[in-house]
Amino acid sequence: MAVNKGYTGYNKELNAMAATHAYIRLSTLMSQIESWQATRASVLTHLGVMLNGVSKLGERSFFSRTKRFGAHTSDGDEIFCDLGGEAVTQILSRLTVALQSARGEGAQTRNAKRGAAPGTSQVENEEQGQTDQTLAISNAVAELMIFVRTKDFTMNECYTQDSFEAKYNLKWEGSSXRDGVSGKLRAQIVEEFQNRLIIADDLGIFPRRDVDGVIIRNEPEVVYSELEDKLLSFESSVYHPKAVTVEFEVPVATGTTTTDDEITTEDVEMVIVTEVLVDDESDYYWLYFVLLLTSFLITCFILLSRRFIHFLGNRGGPGAPLCRRFATRLWSIRLWLLRKATRRYGNLGVVRKTHSQTTMRKYLRDYNFQLEEWETAIGCTPREALIVADQHILVRAVQRIVDSVGDVDSVDAVRKVFNGYKVRNFKIEKWLNKQTVNSALAVLNDSTVPENVVLSEGMLSLQTATFEEVLRCNVESQRESAYFNELIALQFAFRLVGTPEFSDFVLAYKGPAYPCYVEAINRHGTCIIQHHVDEDQKRKNDRAIEWLLMAGQGAFVVSSVVTTGVVVFKIHKWLKQRLLLRALSMLPSVGGGGNGGGGGSLPPQALELFDRAGTFEERLAALQNGLDLSPENMEVFTPEELKTEIRHVVQAYADSSYHVADEPYLRGVGVTVVTGLPEAVGEITTTGSEVSSVDTSISLGVPGRARRRAVSKNTRMYPSTSGQSYNSYKSPRVSGKSGVGSMKMKIASKPMAS
């Protein structure tokens, strides 16, 4: 039987919306508004074109039960705009009124040639009115463009095909052999036909072939109905290893029925549609075999392992404790498998789906207007039965609201379910608020103030009731009151004070201005003002927190820089200390005469005492005690000259940040050097005094190889100066590092007076 295409879940509300709302592509709407903005609204001809475009904007009957939303486009992501929304309708109405009231440019001026010239005041009045009308039209077009670009419009009034069907719970099902099919659907049909041929050939029921696949030449006819029944039956397709049969029901409208009351109803028939699929990409023979073999082994172990386990447990002799433990473990495994098998066999054929509060909360959190009711499991607990009952209440209340037959009681039932499970669904809350406003307006806009109302004791009168009294009122006790329906509607509406939905309620309210309603409007305004104040305060607090975070980050950076500087300073100080001690330890000893040298370096004990000393005298005493100042080692250098050399080493490797005890070294070097060489002052020639004032590297005038050889032998090397006589003057002492580790050595001296 052929199946017609159609929407499932299509109702009266959607039918009315399709007839009254106009839809248009978002790109087309933007282009149209931009063209209106570029049009001169002061020309009468242009006004007519704009008015015609506004009145025919969009397409009505854009969808129906048999016409899919956006079906005329091949792109499913095309965006369509609903022009029937309340905000869009108001803006378009203002634009239409502005266009209809405009008269165009210069009616009196253009008609001046046909009769008497108009007066000056008449022309000025006409130009002023025309300017105001043009400004009103331009403002209306600009307002429409601004609203179209807002997030509210794009989120609530713009749809794709999938989002529209998901919002209104529509499902497009069915197929028709008479309708034209797209390329994608044609490919699916061909693929399904090929799958049917493959299955028929494998099962041996292919037309004009026997079981072995041999072609039958003289077969008179083929009974295609039997072939289709065999192909689509579960018994036949299940034997094919790659066949999958899917069956589902589709409601199809077979006709309409008109009653005596001229009420037309549609006759709906459920049609079963079956699809046969073939999986050509994977084979599961090995998986079936492994599972079957595993089941067989487990069954054999449960049935045949009892005697073997008893044999292991009762065995004596060597290894008996190990066998007993192994038997105990096998026995526990056997009992566990036996319990699992018993439980599986007892529940065979029973599919139980449990429902807990966790699953219900997840269902409510992700609720998207699903209307399928849960089934109660066999032998469920009372708690599960209550959860399923709450789900049924929710679904039925939502169904009544969607079908436009619900009231505030249905909205309250949905709210109670969400509040009972302490779940907040923002989308559902906004939808419920909107439905509350619609239900309340349907009651209040049609109500009138009754005259000569007589209320019994305890009944609340809306003529004198306050806002708080309406909210705290027990509506069940007011059932006999003349204001019962209005009281319920106002109570539900007053709960929305401070929300955007209450603003919509105020705009659409046409009922009596009760004192409680006026008080609710004032409270709503106060709540809105307080909301803006809170938003401003929140924004200021966020800005203050940002500044605090930035200040904290800046303090952290400064602290990191200071910490890094301190660490670098300590490392620098430690390096200076190590270099000073190494330079002192590597000083050449007093030679034993000639180039042979002799003696040893400063002992480690003297260097440790020097490092731990806190005053100048203690450090100098530590170095003096560590020197070998015996007469046999003083043949070339005097003790004063050796002390001077030590001072030069301290000067070269210590700075003002190293140690306070080294300041006397740095301040007294020049004086000590001069006083340490009194005999050489008068005997130095002019050339010699010039040379003695030089502070240069020892590598000047000395080859690198000779310098390294002299350093290795502890021999003093001096720069060669031709043509000068030293007489009895002893050359300046070499200070700094001795050549070990490529240390730099300097010649330090003070200029001498002639």
Curated annotation (Swiss-Prot):
It holds the Pfam family TMV_coat. Its main location: virion. Transmembrane segments: none annotated. One of its GO terms (cellular component) is viral capsid. It is found in: Virion. Residues 713-730 have a biased composition (Polar residues). GO terms for molecular function: structural molecule activity. This protein is translated as a fusion protein by episodic readthrough of the termination codon at the end of the capsid protein. Readthrough of the terminator codon TGA occurs between the codons for Ser-176 and Arg-178, thereby producing the 84 kDa readthrough protein. Minor capsid protein involved in virus transmission by the vector. This is 84 kDa readthrough protein. It comes from Soil-borne wheat mosaic virus (strain United States/Nebraska/1981) (SBWMV). The lineage of its organism: Viruses, Riboviria, Orthornavirae, Kitrinoviricota, Alsuviricetes.
